């Protein structure tokens, strides 16, 4: 069998003859290795503490954030069955439209600390700290051969970039599944790199487990990094080809088992004794995987929750993400979320590979570039060309890859600064970052108008200093230029990320940036919009093509019952719902008592009146009420602390049937029916079944007005 020398990245794992003894594990944790500069490990801890402070500070400002997922977490604190399935309500009528892994973490936090805004979002913020640490650890290992200082500085830069990405600052303080998704994918990257020095089966199996649970977080999106991880292990693992193949097989089995156990459990569970699988057309998880959360996202199409609806001012099929194409990630919709350092990352990838040249395929630095580059290219291309519904906040999944490339490629170019390609590469990264930062900051010209000029001028002067440093007598200018250029290059993205953390984000479509700004076209930038805007499906009085998904979907117009138009879906994109023709659409709702509600019905400004709250809270029925649509039901659940039946779920699911609803009413399981207007009106529930239920209720029960809402008491027929 072919043998390999112990790589630099793993030499500390074995005692070297004559080498000084290693510090105890606790000392290494806080001080690093003996040969590390004294400031390196404290710098890491400073970065992690700073990330924790920024992401935890005023965490409750957003209330319950996305009420759709918040209601599911509340349900999980009351019912272990709801916890397991990811039910929207504690009486287990229907699930959310995603697998429940992210809910499990938040439910456990809420069970320990009590259900509140802080306990809901605490795990999300801590996942940011974990992601920063994992990116640091991954980059440091791939750069170890460059020397401990260069490796650690590159790793610190990568970790900082993750924390300073606006999309990360948004989603790691929000209750959507994306925070856990990013953490798990990053854990998979770290495990893959740990597996390389000796072709470890244990570490590559852990990578498979991480991606398996990423699948249970957001299904197929969690597997977009799989090609990069597989190629890196196959090419760079320091073991025989046979053992590499076996290792990949073990990883595949680990992935399937860790992802499939829940799918199998749901499939084997009698359908009549579990909640309906939200987002599916046939009450199965597989339909959710390959339809609503699968091909529907890629190819679009109506009748599928992943499909796009009307796009208003945008291009058909773009649904909040802008038109498809290579420039989508740089468009106003997505650019402010993720693209601040994207040009620099692409430069780092190309020139980094040039710098490593023809080294052995197992070279750790090359492996790092391939891992992060494969992650960025595959995921970025899918996001750029998918025709189904996509939202700008999805791009948070690119943050670790961009950070990894900037840290790895930047360190390689710095190490090669005595060569022309190293100096020109560093200058190019800084110059393009400064120029693109100016463009992005210019999207909000009234916000800190001086900042974009500081970024541009400072960055270009720094790049010029690096070029001037090519003169032998001015080599110190390279160091000064790199340090200053890094500072100016990170200023724009850091400022925008910090501004994002100071703004309340509630409802279904959060957005990055300072108060009053929005990254989506529907919030004021050109070329944007999603369904529900004038000229698109879901305008006033209409419905969004009969389907909306909890992550995206399109909007519905208001029905006659006074419901506001819904935003996008629970995974949506902008911090404030675009104002609709009837004037509704504030994203930051409060209840009558002034408490944050996590975004009113549909992410709009509607709230539950105290009269309706008291009425439903006093009900002892299995479901205090039934209402069309998951977002309407979610807000009622949060306000009344009761289980509410969401007719039609989020995307016009065929549940319940009229016969099932009538049977539950006859059994006294549903206390009230709260009207959402003609044909549904609330998010989801716009199906013919929902209309039939509403017509049947109106024909057999007396309508009363409670707090401005039409309510039917289902305990007394007319």
Language-model-detected regions and their locations in the chain:
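Structural recognition of the beta-strand scaffold that forms the well-ordered cores
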Residues: 124, 181-183, 223, 288, ...
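Transmembrane helical bundles and short interhelical boundary loops of multi-pass, membrane-embedded
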Residues: 417-518
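Transmembrane-lumen/periplasm boundary regions of multi-pass, lipid-linked membrane glycan transferases
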Residues: 28, 66-70, 75-79, 226-354, ...
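Membrane-integral, polyisoprenol-dependent glycosyltransferases
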Residues: 1-287, 291-301, 313-425, 432-436, ...
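Helix N-cap/beta->alpha junction signal
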Residues: 165, 491, 629-630
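Alpha-helical scaffolding within the catalytic cores
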Residues: 273, 281, 655-664
């Amino acid at each position: 069998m072919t043998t390999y020398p112990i790589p630099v990245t793993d030499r500390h794992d074995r005692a070297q003859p004559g080498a000084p003894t290693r510090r105890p594990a606790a000392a290494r944790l806080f001080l690093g290795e003996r040969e590390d500069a004294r400031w390196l490990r404290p710098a890491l801890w400073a970065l992690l503490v700073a990330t924790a402070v920024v992401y935890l500070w005023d965490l409750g400002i957003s209330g319950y954030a996305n009420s759709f997922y918040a209601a599911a977490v509340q349900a999980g604190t009351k019912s272990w069955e709801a916890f397991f399935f990811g039910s929207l309500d504690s009486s287990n009528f229907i699930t959310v439209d995603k697998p429940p892994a992210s809910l499990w973490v938040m439910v456990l936090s809420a069970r320990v600390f009590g259900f509140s805004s802080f306990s809901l979002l605490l795990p999300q913020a801590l996942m940011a700290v974990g992601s920063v640490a994992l990116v640091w650890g991954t980059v440091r290992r791939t750069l170890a051969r460059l020397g401990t200082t260069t490796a650690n500085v590159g790793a610190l830069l990568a970790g900082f970039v993750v924390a300073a990405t606006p999309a990360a600052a948004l989603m790691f303080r929000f209750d959507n599944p994306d925070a856990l998704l990013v953490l798990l994918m990053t854990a998979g990257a770290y495990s893959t790199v740990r597996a390389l020095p000796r072709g470890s089966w244990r570490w590559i199996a852990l990578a498979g487990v991480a991606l398996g649970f990423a699948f249970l977080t957001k299904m197929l999106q969690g597997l977009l990094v799989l090609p990069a991880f597989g190629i890196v292990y196959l090419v760079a693992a320091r073991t025989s080809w046979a053992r590499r193949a076996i290792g990949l097989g073990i990883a595949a089995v680990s992935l399937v088992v860790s992802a499939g156990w829940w799918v199998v459990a749901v499939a084997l569970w009698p359908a009549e004794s579990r909640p309906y699988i939200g987002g599916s057309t046939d009450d199965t998880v597989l339909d959710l995987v390959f339809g609503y959360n699968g091909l529907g996202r890629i190819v679009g199409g109506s009748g599928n929750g992943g499909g796009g609806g009307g796009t208003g001012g945008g291009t058909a099929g773009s649904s909040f993400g802008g038109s498809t194409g290579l420039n989508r990630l740089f468009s106003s919709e997505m650019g402010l979320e993720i693209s601040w350092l994207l040009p620099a990352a692409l430069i780092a990838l190309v020139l980094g590979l040039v710098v490593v040249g023809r080294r052995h395929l197992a070279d750790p630095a090359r492996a790092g570039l391939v891992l992060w580059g494969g992650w960025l290219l595959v995921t970025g291309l899918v996001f750029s060309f998918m025709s189904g519904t996509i939202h700008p906040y999805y791009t948070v999944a690119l943050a670790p890859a961009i950070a990894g490339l900037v840290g790895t490629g930047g360190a390689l170019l710095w190490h090669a600064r005595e060569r022309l390609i190293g100096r020109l590469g560093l200058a190019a990264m800084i110059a393009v970052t400064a120029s693109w930062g100016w463009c992005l900051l210019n999207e909000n010209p009234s916000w800190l108008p001086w900042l974009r000029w500081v970024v541009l001028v400072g960055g270009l002067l720094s790049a010029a200093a690096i070029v001037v440093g090519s003169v032998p007598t001015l080599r110190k200018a390279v160091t000064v230029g790199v340090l200053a250029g890094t500072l100016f290059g990170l200023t724009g993205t850091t400022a925008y990320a910090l501004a994002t953390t100071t703004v309340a984000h509630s409802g279904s479509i959060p957005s990055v940036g300072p108060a009053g700004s929005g990254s989506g076209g529907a919030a004021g930038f050109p070329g944007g919009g999603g369904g529900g805007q004038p000229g698109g499906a879901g305008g006033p009085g209409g419905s969004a093509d009969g389907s909306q998904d909890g992550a995206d979907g399109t909007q519905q117009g208001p029905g006659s019952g006074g419901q506001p138009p819904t935003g996008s879906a629970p995974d949506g994109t902008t911090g404030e719902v675009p104002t609709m023709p009837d004037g509704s659409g504030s994203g930051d709702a409060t209840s009558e008592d002034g408490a944050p509600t996590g975004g009113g019905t549909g992410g709009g400004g509607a709230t539950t009146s105290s009269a309706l709250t008291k009425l439903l809270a006093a009900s002892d029925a299995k479901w205090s009420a039934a209402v069309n649509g998951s977002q309407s039901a979610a807000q009622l659940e949060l306000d009344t602390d009761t289980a509410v039946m969401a007719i039609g779920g989020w995307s016009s699911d065929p549940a319940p049937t009229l016969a099932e609803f009538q049977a539950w009413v006859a059994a006294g399981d549903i206390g009230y029916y709260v009207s959402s207007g003609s044909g549904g009106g609330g998010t989801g529930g716009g199906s013919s079944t929902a209309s039939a239920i509403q017509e049947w209720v109106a024909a057999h029960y007396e309508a009363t007005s409670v707090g401005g809402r039409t309510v039917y008491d289902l305990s007394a027929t007319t």
